[in-house]
């Protein structure tokens, strides 16, 4: 547990115990995995949402919506986020 409360991983594990939630999560799994990677990369760099937004050239509210899953970003936007985090964007079709 972190100082701020329950960790993302703990929260996700707890929520996945609910069958209805788990089914919906599986449908949205690629989106949640991307969000999780973005949040993890940002936190590993001790970067705030505001700092990431500045690097990306967008508003903090867009980063907040992205991280909360309330935003359907373009590939170009995701590429900017990845680059701002020192990462590469990779898309795979299975």
Question: What are these regions, as identified by a protein language model?
Answer:
Residues 37-51:
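Short basic helix-loop element that most often maps to the first helix and adjoining turn
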Residues 43, 54, 83:
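Alpha-helical residues within the helix-turn-helix
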Residues 76-91:
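DNA major-groove recognition helix of helix-turn-helix/homeodomain DNA-binding modules
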Residues 46, 57, 68-69, 86:
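Central "turn" residue of the DNA-binding helix-turn-helix
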Residues 67, 93:
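DNA major-groove recognition helix of helix-turn-helix
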Residues 38, 52-53, 63-66:
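Conserved hydrophobic/aromatic packing and binding residues within compact polymer-binding modules
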Residues 1-36:
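N-terminal flexible/basic segments that precede or flank functional cores
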